[in-house]
Curated annotation (Swiss-Prot):
Keywords: Isomerase. This is Ribose-5-phosphate isomerase A. The gene is rpiA. The active site is at E104. Belongs to the ribose 5-phosphate isomerase family.
Length: 220
């Protein structure tokens, strides 16, 4: 396991402390979330099950014997645990590098507490070095791309990739994201946009940050 993975794994272990006994919890998508799923395997008898933010996560949860629930069949979730691509000190994030941003945002919004787990490289002063994913309806791809150019970004179509919802992803490079909440709302209002990967309206409540010295820093 490389150093970055060790930091992710340490944060994932700490996140178990936030899982209520007997609960149905929300589980995210991606390499860091996978470390959390590995940790869940140790306590699977203590929880009722999980709501997954992607088909990949659902498959992984089922493989370790955790029951996966449809979000429509459960109420508010006590906690959602997921990673991020970038996070700032206000706990605003860029997410969706794995393409599951819409379902991640839905499950996060359905949860009382959002625990973000990350290695220290993900904490940044300003969001935007990581390209911002935007999920778009296929027929609106070019329209949305032109609007994103007017915002100062350089959108790139993620070719040969389709989301779990049957849509496309534009990865937007070089956006100046000084006001994440305003940028999120501006992009989400564009016709044809399902959602963008800015999580400012539904930011994290707690950041568990794996450090290179083996510790996990808690930021709230």
């Amino acid at each position: 396991m490389n150093e970055q993975d060790k930091m992710k794994a340490a944060a994932a272990r700490k996140a178990i402390d936030y899982v209520p006994e007997g609960a149905i919890i929300g589980v995210g998508t991606g390499s860091t979330a996978n470390f959390f799923i590995d940790e869940l395997a140790r306590i699977k008898d203590r929880i009722e099950g999980a709501v997954a933010s992607s088909q990949a996560t659902a498959d992984r949860l089922k493989a370790i014997g955790i029951q996966v629930f449809d979000l429509n069949g459960v109420g508010e979730l006590p906690v959602y645990v997921d990673g991020c691509d970038e996070i700032n000190h206000y706990l605003h994030m860029i997410k969706g590098g794995g393409g599951a941003l819409t379902r991640e945002k839905i499950v996060a919004t359905s949860s009382r507490q959002f625990i973000c787990i990350a290695d220290e490289s993900k904490l940044v002063k300003r969001l935007g070095a990581f390209p911002l994913p935007v999920e778009v309806i296929p027929m609106a791809r070019s329209l949305v791309a032109r609007k994103l150019v007017k915002l100062g970004g350089h959108p790139e179509w993620r070719e040969n990739f389709v989301t779990d919802n049957g849509n496309l992803i534009l990865d937007v490079h070089d956006l100046a994201i000084d006001q994440p909440l305003e940028m999120e709302e501006t992009i989400n209002r564009m016709a044809g946009v399902v959602t963008c990967g800015l999580f400012a309206r539904r930011r994290a409540d707690v950041l568990l940050l794996g450090r290179s010295d083996g510790t996990v820093q808690t930021i709230e």
